[in-house]
Amino acid sequence: MKLISPPVRRTATAPATAPGARLGWLDALRGIAALIVALHHFDVLRMLPFGGAVWRNFDMGLFGVMLFFIVSGYIIPASLERRGDVRAFWIGRIFRIYPALIAAFVLSILMLPAGDGSVALLRTGDDLASLVANGLMLQDLLGVINGMNVTWTLCYEMVFYFLVTALFTRGLHRHSAPIAAALAGLALAVGTAVGTQLISAELGSTRQLLLIVTPLVLAGLAGVLSGRPVLTGTGALLLGGVGLFLITLNSRAPAFETWMIFATMFAGTVVYRAQHGQLARLPALLSCGFVVVAGVLVGWLYNHGEALDRTWSSGWKAWSVGYLAAWALFGVGFLLRGRRFPRVLTWLGAISFSVYLLHIPLLRTIEPLVGVPPQPSSVLGRIAWTALFLGVVLAVSHLMYRLVEMPMQRLGRRVQKAADRRWPSAAHPAPAASTAPAETVPTEAAPAEAVRVLSGPPRTGG
């Protein structure tokens, strides 16, 4: 379903910066975040003499999560609006995420030692519910344990796709600034007043929720993939409504964290719109500034007591400093966006989704082979162990990227073209035309890679 025409390429004022430099800063940020993710789960802080102090005052996990969410918010709406084709956007998303996710599940199950719980896809007591919820990528919002320890953030990413698509089809996609500010205000106002997982309190209610949500989501996806304006709009509203319902009443994360995740993603969109002249700088600065301040304040106000069991952080300082640091690094990357970044960082950004999916299964596979735990006691031993872990993760992730991600993305483009030939999208008047030059719209990225652990029993400590 094409809602807007592709923006006309501007030739009179072509940017002087090379394309690689324009997008290199985003790849570099994803690469840095992926490295932080891997080292966080590697428990690198336990090997440092000052690691305890860092853990108490800086949450590496939250830092990585929020940095990925900011980047995702910057990129995802732009990739949808680039051609104004909802079906093309969703086909692209499906072929970017699911092949790598399925391959990671299969590879992990094959290589993990017996008894390891890193993959819980078929170990939840209800295999069908686990497969369906994880297949929809909504398990963390349906009360179902994540099939893989780190996939909880893909649920919030998926709901972001739902919301962005719904806003786009209604012509409301340019209202990113008030949406981001409103969500941040909601996080501040609600805090922990609204409980978590209010619907799926036990297995029976979880199954009932699945029976309701699954056909609604499938119907919504069928609509947005139809290429028909009415069906696309209806499907998008259905997906947006389901997503909003789930994050409001059945999120595993505390309300303040849930709403801040979405405020952060929409604030990333605000940055993109301000950069490309779709939004004045003052409202953009006010909106993003309020989101950043709210992110720091919600940690101070609410990240205490029982909330720590669901945010998996050591305290409010760790949450607030980690959140602020994510925005600080994004800001540095944004200021340096016209420069060329080291190739190793852009390469790391390219393979970051595979790094995210595979680093824990690879860690659990390597550990018994080298006799860890316990951690090496000598400095040289710790350096060697860290180098071995990173070397294996990066090598296997590179292979996954080349052998799975890239071919499947190419297949997705062929499927999209075939769908356009077989079922041409009907023309639809544009809700609002894009003003960004075509060559400055960033390409789609992998979903927001993240670092938290299991959706079921909360993890305590570092």
Per-segment meaning from a language model:
Residues M1-T17, G333-G349, I360-G462:
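C-terminal "closing" transmembrane helix and its immediate cytosolic amphipathic cap
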Residues A21-L80, F95-L101, F105, A325-L329, ...:
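Functionally critical transmembrane alpha-helices in membrane proteins and complexes, commonly lining
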Residues L23-G24, A53-V65, V144-Y156, G195-L216, ...:
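Interfacial loop-to-helix transition and helix-capping segments at the boundaries
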Residues L35-F42, L183-Q197, L238-S251, G289-H304:
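Aromatic-anchored segments of alpha-helical transmembrane domains
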Residues L62, E257-R273, L285-M406:
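Alpha-helical transmembrane segments of multi-pass integral membrane proteins
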Residues L62-M66, S79-S118, G125, S130-A133, ...:
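Transmembrane alpha-helical segments and their boundary/interface "anchor" motifs
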Residues P77-R83, L112-P113, A166-H175, A219-P229, ...:
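Structural signal for the C-terminal ends of transmembrane alpha-helices
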Residues I97, L101-F162, G185-S200, W319-F330:
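Membrane-interface helix-loop-helix regions
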